Amino acid sequence: MRPAVRALLACAVLGLCLADPERTVRWCTISTHEANKCASFRENVLRILESGPFVSCVKKTSHMDCIKAISNNEADAVTLDGGLVYEAGLKPNNLKPVVAEFHGTKDNPQTHYYAVAVVKKDTDFKLNELRGKKSCHTGLGRSAGWNIPMAKLYKELPDPQESIQRAAANFFSASCVPCADQSSFPKLCQLCAGKGTDKCACSNHEPYFGYSGAFKCLMEGAGDVAFVKHSTVFDNLPNPEDRKNYELLCGDNTRKSVDDYQECYLAMVPSHAVVARTVGGKEDVIWELLNHAQEHFGKDKPDNFQLFQSPHGKDLLFKDSADGFLKIPSKMDFELYLGYEYVTALQNLRESKPPDSSKDECMVKWCAIGHQERTKCDRWSGFSGGAIECETAENTEECIAKIMKGEADAMSLDGGYLYIAGKCGLVPVLAENYKTEGESCKNTPEKGYLAVAVVKTSDANINWNNLKDKKSCHTAVDRTAGWNIPMGLLYSKINNCKFDEFFSAGCAPGSPRNSSLCALCIGSEKGTGKECVPNSNERYYGYTGAFRCLVEKGDVAFVKDQTVIQNTDGNNNEAWAKNLKKENFEVLCKDGTRKPVTDAENCHLARGPNHAVVSRKDKATCVEKILNKQQDDFGKSVTDCTSNFCLFQSNSKDLLFRDDTKCLASIAKKTYDSYLGDDYVRAMTNLRQCSTSKLLEACTFHKP
């Protein structure tokens, strides 16, 4: 055989000679069996994808070595469990999950399960009362049965930094923890039902091993609590009547029905995920490769090569139990993918010293957007005596993400962002009240405010029905009065999301910079580069900014009913506003008529929910306590706060809170949907297909 022919055949076998390096995914393997499956994967991909993407194989000795290899650009991808996804995301690795394995069907893919604590209904202890109880676990080192509950209980365990097993043995009166060190910690195996060498075995030889085994330990009365996953009760008790005998222990030390696992769980445990470099990580090529691969080699496909089978081992390259792949949204870093509870659990288990007792103290880290809010927040922090600290982000979605991750604790949001925050797992804590005063204010949340479309009185021909090709001014994309309500109404008329083509030009901070909806924006007076950003660096941002846009450039402004009044007749002394009269402006009615701005009650687009403070569920009680004290010290009820600090006043407009806030009122039911109301949630759900929110896409990735 001639050398040239021999070389071409070798290239065909290797699948590398003509492969474009940018279209080649270097898959990292950790064993000979994985390397062999990877080689088969490579050859079969070459057979079906002549133009790529291609696969090459890199062999290392451990997943941690693979993480380092990818970080150093010596490999491109590897599949990891949640704990290793966490390690991969930490500095200096800086990797991110790009593709998730899912279980179930394409129509209802599941990328996580809930770790729960199950108890019998006829008992009355809570999660913070488990000391001295008898516990049932799936197995040592397993997520739902060991890692999550031990992390949740970490601060209560005696000397956990010495040995988690010893700490657990001293915390519970007796346990069944299959796979535990029975000779060193006999109490961890005391409840197990296996005989002889099978007692506490790391397999089904121990009757109380695994999810069903741990639940059996509880059912048979051996234990008081079982740490399992949310589906375990349903799998073992198909009769709903039998399930009524059991309850879940919630993180807030309450109990709920086993049906309410989405509201009462210890942590959400994510599926295995493929990780890649955050920068230059080939995430689109990796997805293209795996998407093609699952179409040809996935579950129930006729090809001899199967992605989710491991003939010479178990879970080689991918989990054998996986049913397919889903692309992870680009905004989703490792912390958002894993979730706050799971990340906190992993952090606790990795503590090398006792938990800092100061973490138990109630203080609030407020998230400020941009320089002006940070300046006010720092001043607030100084007057608060340490109760308030400050964190900064460039925009609202970054702040929401920081609160989700525990990098910040709270902020006040309008209804549109509150919807996004709610979808991201945050809860409303206190509502801003704008009209109620006196003693009843803090106990009576208001119904909401009016969203209006404002025009100049001199533009007499403009009405709600002829806004096409007009110049529009918005508070920001995804905000209630400035975007969600008017664009939701507009969508119902034009049946598409091309709002940038409907208006001739506009300023809607948060829009793509090349959009016509950024054309009117003017940015910061301190220099260029801040045009159309959704924070106070854009002078047309927010209620006052959108109204200023109308005064200086636009035809219509979408704001709240009080905006015109607050910026006319001497109420705003800035140069652009000081000579304005409210009579110079009117509001548009949906029936095509117009009315004075003082008659907005009879001429508005819709009623929007008042702004509200949001936080994580675990921090909500602390936030409410601190803010009630802060408004007592610096709120509107204080006779003269100007010599110190005024919580509801700003040097510019609406920094941290709306300036017209009278008080922060307690909310009876702290869920985003009950606070926003059915009509508003329905409108937001309809408008979601027009949403450009990357954070909302990330937060809704894990389906309920």
Curated annotation (Swiss-Prot):
<dbReference type="InterPro" id="IPR030685">
    <property type="entry name" value="Serotransferrin_mammal"/>
</dbReference>
<feature type="disulfide bond">
    <location>
        <begin position="589"/>
        <end position="603"/>
    </location>
</feature>
<feature type="binding site">
    <location>
        <position position="142"/>
    </location>
    <ligand>
        <name>hydrogencarbonate 1</name>
    </ligand>
</feature>
<feature type="binding site">
    <location>
        <position position="543"/>
    </location>
    <ligand>
        <name>Fe(3+) 2</name>
    </ligand>
</feature>
<feature type="disulfide bond">
    <location>
        <begin position="473"/>
        <end position="549"/>
    </location>
</feature>
<keyword id="KW-0732">Signal</keyword>
<feature type="binding site">
    <location>
        <position position="479"/>
    </location>
    <ligand>
        <name>hydrogencarbonate 2</name>
    </ligand>
</feature>
<dbReference type="GO" id="GO:0006879">
    <property type="term" value="P:intracellular iron ion homeostasis"/>
</dbReference>
<feature type="glycosylation site" description="N-linked (GlcNAc...) asparagine">
    <location>
        <position position="514"/>
    </location>
</feature>
<feature type="disulfide bond">
    <location>
        <begin position="424"/>
        <end position="699"/>
    </location>
</feature>
<feature type="disulfide bond">
    <location>
        <begin position="497"/>
        <end position="690"/>
    </location>
</feature>
<feature type="modified residue" description="Dimethylated arginine">
    <location>
        <position position="42"/>
    </location>
</feature>
<feature type="disulfide bond">
    <location>
        <begin position="367"/>
        <end position="399"/>
    </location>
</feature>
<dbReference type="InterPro" id="IPR016357">
    <property type="entry name" value="Transferrin"/>
</dbReference>
<keyword id="KW-0410">Iron transport</keyword>
<keyword id="KW-0677">Repeat</keyword>
<dbReference type="GO" id="GO:0005769">
    <property type="term" value="C:early endosome"/>
</dbReference>
<feature type="binding site">
    <location>
        <position position="113"/>
    </location>
    <ligand>
        <name>Fe(3+) 1</name>
    </ligand>
</feature>
<keyword id="KW-0597">Phosphoprotein</keyword>
<feature type="disulfide bond">
    <location>
        <begin position="136"/>
        <end position="217"/>
    </location>
</feature>
<comment type="subunit">
    <text>Monomer. Part of a complex composed of SLC40A1/ferroportin, TF/transferrin and HEPH/hephaestin that transfers iron from cells to transferrin.</text>
</comment>
<dbReference type="GO" id="GO:0006826">
    <property type="term" value="P:iron ion transport"/>
</dbReference>
<feature type="binding site">
    <location>
        <position position="482"/>
    </location>
    <ligand>
        <name>hydrogencarbonate 2</name>
    </ligand>
</feature>
<dbReference type="InterPro" id="IPR001156">
    <property type="entry name" value="Transferrin-like_dom"/>
</dbReference>
<dbReference type="GO" id="GO:0055037">
    <property type="term" value="C:recycling endosome"/>
</dbReference>
<feature type="binding site">
    <location>
        <position position="449"/>
    </location>
    <ligand>
        <name>Fe(3+) 2</name>
    </ligand>
</feature>
<dbReference type="GO" id="GO:0019731">
    <property type="term" value="P:antibacterial humoral response"/>
</dbReference>
<feature type="disulfide bond">
    <location>
        <begin position="377"/>
        <end position="390"/>
    </location>
</feature>
<dbReference type="GO" id="GO:0008199">
    <property type="term" value="F:ferric iron binding"/>
</dbReference>
<comment type="function">
    <text>Transferrins are iron binding transport proteins which can bind two Fe(3+) ions in association with the binding of an anion, usually bicarbonate. It is responsible for the transport of iron from sites of absorption and heme degradation to those of storage and utilization. Serum transferrin may also have a further role in stimulating cell proliferation.</text>
</comment>
<feature type="disulfide bond">
    <location>
        <begin position="362"/>
        <end position="622"/>
    </location>
</feature>
<feature type="binding site">
    <location>
        <position position="272"/>
    </location>
    <ligand>
        <name>Fe(3+) 1</name>
    </ligand>
</feature>
<keyword id="KW-0325">Glycoprotein</keyword>
<feature type="binding site">
    <location>
        <position position="144"/>
    </location>
    <ligand>
        <name>hydrogencarbonate 1</name>
    </ligand>
</feature>
<feature type="domain" description="Transferrin-like 1">
    <location>
        <begin position="25"/>
        <end position="351"/>
    </location>
</feature>
<dbReference type="GO" id="GO:0005615">
    <property type="term" value="C:extracellular space"/>
</dbReference>
<feature type="disulfide bond">
    <location>
        <begin position="250"/>
        <end position="264"/>
    </location>
</feature>
<feature type="disulfide bond">
    <location>
        <begin position="507"/>
        <end position="521"/>
    </location>
</feature>
<protein>
    <recommendedName>
        <fullName>Serotransferrin</fullName>
    </recommendedName>
</protein>
<feature type="signal peptide">
    <location>
        <begin position="1"/>
        <end position="19"/>
    </location>
</feature>
<keyword id="KW-0813">Transport</keyword>
<feature type="modified residue" description="Phosphoserine">
    <location>
        <position position="691"/>
    </location>
</feature>
